[in-house]
């Protein structure tokens, strides 16, 4: 059975109390009513966070008259928090679960994702994290942020430029470019080791890393031979294999979910456009033609779509097209600089950077109802990369 509801295009800080309705967009989703009991302040926090998670899922929506009724009881424990949940429909029980942990937001996200899965069979993204670069007057920070009011956590700070982070499929590493040594070198931060090491430092540019789906290789941009080209990098041996052989600039690679193709940017016709080639190199096929500037491609997890940045009317916006180049759809309309799109792990959301509220920040858009939410806080933030499912 399918349910119809109205979702609004909104802009708000993640975890904020108020959403700002802008443009109503019809979407199909399952209505869920929430009843949260227990400690008053704690229950209020849980109700707000779970409601935000549900409304941003793209599959469910909160409603006073829901197909499913979720009853949640929250309490404090000596070790943190406890949450007992019961979900029913028409009086028939659908799921009963208990959660314990040190952080109430983590429990809320876990329940929200379980609820999405139990009602739809699809994975939720409430428990996932996003990493991005933040620039302040002191320098540059590689930060990771959960989808709630908790502040971002800096995993690396430098007075020199940090850019183009890419989260590994196993969740343990983020590879990024740093100018710490005076050159644009590739570094790798490991969560398990809580440290970063330099992994590639050939003369010139070492940037725009993109992991293969199996984590066995990275597509990177190197300018070791004069102009920028796409190379494959082995993350264990650090050996490189050149894939593009043109005199033009080739950059911003991204793997298809099968790992057999790479989409990238090239200015071989005089301005940046998107091309696709086999992951072993060879002949490329041009994918874009409707805009004079296209960059930053990102392939969806299901392989059906490619998100990218394109210039239109003097401004830069986020677009999505089918993997064959057809069915082009513009996603952003506010601001003048919307770029760096990256897909969430379920393919229902895209993170990107934008100046739509005046300052450059990281946003997320839910593609079913076109709901937009700001994730980053203060400072100039950009270059998001999404964690895989299961990262904690």
Give, region by region, the residue ranges found by the protein language model.
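Hydrophobic beta-strand positions that form the internal "hydrophobic ladder"
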Residues: 130, 174, 215-219, 259-263, ...
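A structural "domain/chain start" motif
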Residues: 16-48
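Structural motif
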Residues: 81-82, 138-143, 183-187, 227-231, ...
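Multi-bladed beta-propeller domains
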Residues: 146-161, 190-207, 233-249, 277-293, ...
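Amphipathic beta-strand/beta-sheet edge segments enriched in Tyr/Trp
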Residues: 67-114
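Residue-level detector of Asp-centered blade-edge/turn motifs that repeat once per structural unit
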Residues: 124-126, 169-170, 213-214, 257-258, ...
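C-terminal/domain-edge helix-coil "capping" segments
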Residues: 17-30, 100-156
């Amino acid at each position: 059975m399918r349910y119809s509801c109205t979702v609004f295009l909104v802009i708000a800080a993640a975890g904020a109390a108020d959403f700002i309705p802008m443009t109503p967009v019809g979407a199909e989703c399952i209505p869920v009513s929430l009843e949260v009991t227990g400690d008053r302040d704690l229950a209020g926090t849980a109700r707000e966070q779970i409601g935000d998670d549900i409304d941003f899922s793209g599959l469910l929506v909160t409603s006073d008259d829901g197909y499913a009724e979720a009853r949640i009881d929250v309490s404090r424990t000596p070790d943190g928090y406890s949450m007992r949940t019961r979900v029913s429909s028409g009086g028939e029980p659908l799921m009963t679960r208990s959660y314990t942990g040190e952080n109430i937001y983590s429990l809320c996200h876990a329940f929200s994702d379980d609820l999405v899965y139990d009602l739809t069979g699809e994975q939720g993204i409430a428990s996932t994290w996003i990493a991005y670069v933040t620039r302040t007057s002191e320098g540059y920070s590689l930060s990771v942020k959960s989808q709630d009011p908790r502040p971002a956590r800096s995993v690396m700070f430098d007075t020199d430029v940090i850019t183009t982070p890419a989260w590994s499929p196993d969740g343990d590493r983020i590879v990024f470019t740093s100018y710490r040594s005076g050159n644009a070198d590739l570094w790798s931060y490991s969560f398990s080791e809580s440290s970063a090491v330099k992994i590639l430092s050939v003369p010139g540019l070492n940037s725009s890393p993109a992991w293969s789906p199996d984590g066995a290789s990275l597509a990177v941009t190197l300018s070791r031979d004069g102009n920028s080209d796409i190379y494959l990098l082995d993350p264990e041996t650090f050996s490189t294999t050149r894939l593009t052989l043109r005199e033009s600039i080739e950059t911003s690679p991204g793997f298809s979910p099968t790992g057999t193709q790479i989409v990238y940017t090239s200015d071989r016709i005089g301005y940046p456009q998107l091309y696709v080639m086999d992951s072993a190199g060879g002949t490329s096929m041009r994918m874009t033609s409707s805009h004079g500037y296209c960059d930053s491609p990102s392939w969806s997890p299901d392989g059906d779509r490619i998100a990218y940045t394109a210039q239109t009317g003097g401004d830069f916006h986020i677009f999505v097209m089918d993997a064959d180049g057809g069915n082009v759809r513009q996603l952003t309309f506010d601001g003048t600089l919307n770029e760096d799109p990256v897909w969430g792990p379920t393919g229902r959301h895209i993170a990107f950077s934008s100046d739509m509220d005046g300052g450059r920040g990281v946003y997320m858009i839910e593609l079913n109802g076109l709901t937009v939410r700001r994730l980053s806080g203060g400072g100039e933030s950009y270059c998001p990369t999404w964690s895989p499912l299961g990262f904690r």
